[in-house]
C-alpha cells in the first residue's frame, strides 16, 4: 500500500513560512514520518536527518533564521485507496485524503471541500455524544429564553442538533462545488 503523512510545523511569521530552508525542513520531516513511522514528535525529532538529527537541523535553522519553529503534530496513513493531498492558504490548512473508489477529480474536489468546510467527521456516528448533548442543551436554553412553549422545545432542540450534524459532517455538508 501507499503511505502518506501530513505534519504541522509552526513558525512565527509568514516570511519564515515561505523560506526555502524552512519548507525543505518541513518536507524532510514529512518524508521521515512516512519512511520511519515514528510514534510521536519526540521520536521523530531524534531520527537521522542530513548530517545529524531532525531536532539538530531544526535548532540550527532556528539559530540561522532567528525565529522559533516547532514540530507540533503529524498523522501518517497507509492508504486503502488512493491518497490525495491539498494544501491551502500558504500551507496553513492541509488535507490528506484516502479515497477508495472515485476518480482523480473527485479526490481533488473532496480534499479541497474538506479544507474549506472543515468537517469534524464523515457522518453523525463520528460526532461525540458530548458534542451532540452540548448542542442540544444550548438549543433548549435558547428556546426557553425565547419563551417558546414547553411542548415545542424538544422539537426545536432536535432540529438544532440535526442542523449541527449537517454542518459538521462531510456527508451532511453542501458540497463546495455544488
Regions flagged by a language model, labelled:
Residues 1-178:
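N-terminal assembly/interaction segments in proteins that build large macromolecular machines
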Amino acid at each position: 500500500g501507499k503511505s502518506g503523512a501530513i505534519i504541522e510545523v509552526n513558525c512565527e511569521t509568514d516570511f519564515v513560512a515561505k523560506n526555502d530552508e524552512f519548507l525543505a525542513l518541513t518536507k524532510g520531516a514529512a518524508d521521515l514520518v512516512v519512511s520511519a513511522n515514528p510514534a510521536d514528535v519526540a521520536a521523530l525529532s531524534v531520527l537521522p536527518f542530513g548530517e545529524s538529527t531532525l531536532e539538530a537541523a531544526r535548532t540550527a535553522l532556528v539559530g540561522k533564521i532567528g525565529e522559533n519553529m516547532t514540530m507540533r503534530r503529524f498523522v501518517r496513513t497507509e492508504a486503502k485507496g488512493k491518497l490525495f493531498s491539498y494544501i491551502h492558504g500558504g500551507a496553513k490548512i492541509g488535507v490528506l485524503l484516502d479515497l477508495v473508489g472515485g476518480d482523480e477529480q473527485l479526490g481533488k474536489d473532496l480534499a479541497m471541500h474538506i479544507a474549506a468546510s472543515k468537517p469534524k467527521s464523515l457522518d453523525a456516528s463520528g460526532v461525540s455524544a458530548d458534542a451532540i448533548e452540548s448542542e442540544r442543551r444550548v438549543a433548549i436554553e435558547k428556546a426557553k429564553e425565547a419563551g417558546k412553549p414547553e411542548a415545542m422545545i424538544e422539537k426545536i432542540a432536535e432540529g438544532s442538533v440535526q442542523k449541527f450534524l449537517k454542518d459538521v459532517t462531510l456527508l451532511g455538508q453542501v458540497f463546495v462545488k455544488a
